[in-house]
């Protein structure tokens, strides 16, 4: 029996991987424009990082982490999200001592969660995320959201919307927490076991429950906006003003809480309303985490960020029938005819590659017709034909595959000649 790919994973094959490369390239470009620098953290971390950083009441920690004991009996976990590892690196490498604050970082990498595989949701998936650590300015909140929206617009997506909320500062959250406990406690037995355990630990997570979302108490639960103190309300209002100035439309949703424990103040999600999805689908989300750096062992430093699934983005592109400008062609295919020409063809291909061109040649001793078919399949812009007659004359026959025009080019200047034609 053949060995197959594990459930919840996928092979990204040639022909498809170019789409991923294009998206990742665009992500890096927009981060360059906003002055975010790339960071790469380990794929696995100490489990304690996620217990403290993500929160032990979250579904990620309780149900979805891939954790294991190594041979030194240390508990390690494949990273389920990117923020906690970035903050750990920020603290461990004392980036908070840099003169230029805030520290603005981005990452593109594999994450792992044990979830039920479904469309756009895998157990191994790729996230693009950014983190801005070291500023309490509402302008950085607006910038993070604007960057995400501009990235999606740059991909051609039109049917997206930003959903916004504020969870307030620590005092506002505590007041709201007390109100939620008072609201749910008399009838908590009617809720799922997860919600019952969340009541004392983190009642805000009850609002995010998928099982009990239609319970009548959900619709009458106290809203966080009723408990925002003056400072939190002013901060939230300022973020909205800045987004409006930046031409970033948004909707306010007082029930948006996000699934991680570290959020304070601004939280947001970006959703697709494309008809191809059949239902409104979350593409990305993020928010402010003012206590996370301290929780992981660093100084009191505010931060904000977001993460998006590349898999979900690709689904959104398909839902809106968007074709990205991806290059699937090669510059030149070298056709060799006869034994004598084979070695020279290898040298021609080498010289063309050295000149910076993408080149392929035949390695199976196929006839000329079969080699031209290969050139067509590879969408070669030019075909170079080298046979014994061409060798005797010291030339190569060059065919432009777009126009059909052919010309003879001297062998000793061939690579530079083709390179100039392609500039």
Swiss-Prot record:
Localization (cell): Cytoplasm
SUPFAM superfamilies: Class II aaRS ABD-related, Class II aaRS and biotin synthetases
Pfam families on file: HGTP_anticodon, tRNA-synt_His
Description of how the protein assembles with itself and partners: Homodimer.
Family recorded in the similarity comment: Belongs to the class-II aminoacyl-tRNA synthetase family.
A single GO molecular function term of this UniProt record: catalytic activity, acting on a protein
Name of the protein: Histidine--tRNA ligase 2
Catalytic activity from the UniProt record: tRNA(His) + L-histidine + ATP = L-histidyl-tRNA(His) + AMP + diphosphate + H(+)
Cysteine-cysteine disulfides: none
Keywords for this protein: Aminoacyl-tRNA synthetase, ATP-binding, Cytoplasm, Ligase, Nucleotide-binding, Protein biosynthesis
């Amino acid at each position: 029996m053949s060995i197959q790919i594990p459930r919840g994973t996928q092979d990204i094959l040639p022909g498809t991987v170019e789409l991923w490369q294009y998206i990742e390239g665009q992500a890096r470009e927009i981060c360059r424009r906003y002055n975010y620098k790339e960071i790469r953290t380990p794929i696995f971390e100490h489990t304690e990082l996620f217990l403290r950083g993500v929160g032990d009441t979250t579904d990620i920690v309780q149900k979805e982490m891939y954790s294991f004991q190594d041979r030194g009996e240390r508990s390690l976990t494949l990273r389920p999200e990117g923020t906690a590892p970035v903050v750990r690196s920020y603290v461990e490498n004392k980036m908070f001592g840099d003169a230029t604050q805030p520290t603005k970082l981005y990452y593109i990498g594999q994450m792992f969660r044990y979830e039920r595989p479904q469309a756009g949701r895998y157990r191994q998936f790729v996230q693009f995320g950014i983190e801005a650590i070291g500023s309490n300015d509402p302008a950085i909140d607006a910038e993070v959201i604007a960057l995400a929206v501009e990235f999606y617009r740059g991909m051609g997506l039109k049917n997206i919307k930003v959903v916004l909320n504020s969870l307030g500062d620590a005092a506002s959250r505590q007041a709201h927490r007390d109100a939620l406990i008072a609201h749910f406690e008399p009838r908590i037995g009617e809720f799922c076991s997860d919600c019952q355990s969340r009541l004392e630990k983190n009642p805000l997570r009850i609002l995010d429950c998928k099982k009990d979302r239609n319970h009548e108490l959900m619709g009458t639960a106290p809203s966080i906006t009723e408990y925002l103190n003056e400072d939190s309300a002013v901060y939230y209002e300022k973020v909205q003003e800045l987004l409006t100035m930046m031409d970033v439309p948004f909707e306010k949703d007082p029930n948006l809480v996000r699934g991680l424990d570290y959020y304070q103040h601004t939280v947001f999600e970006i959703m697709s309303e494309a008809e191809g999805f059949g239902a409104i689908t979350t593409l990305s989300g993020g928010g402010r985490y003012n206590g996370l750096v301290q929780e992981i062992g660093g100084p009191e430093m505010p931060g904000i960020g977001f993460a998006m699934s590349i898999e979900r983005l690709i689904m959104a592109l398909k839902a809106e029938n968007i074709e990205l400008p991806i290059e699937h062609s090669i510059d030149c295919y070298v056709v060799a005819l006869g034994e004598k020409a084979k070695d020279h063809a290898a040298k021609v291909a080498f010289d063309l590659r050295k000149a910076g061109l993408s080149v392929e040649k035949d390695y199976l001793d196929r006839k000329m017709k079969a080699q031209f078919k290969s050139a067509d399949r590879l969408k070669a812009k030019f075909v170079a034909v080298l046979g014994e007659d061409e060798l005797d004359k010291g030339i190569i026959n060059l065919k432009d595959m777009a126009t059909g025009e052919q010309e003879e080019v001297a062998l000793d200047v061939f690579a530079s000649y083709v390179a100039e034609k392609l500039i």
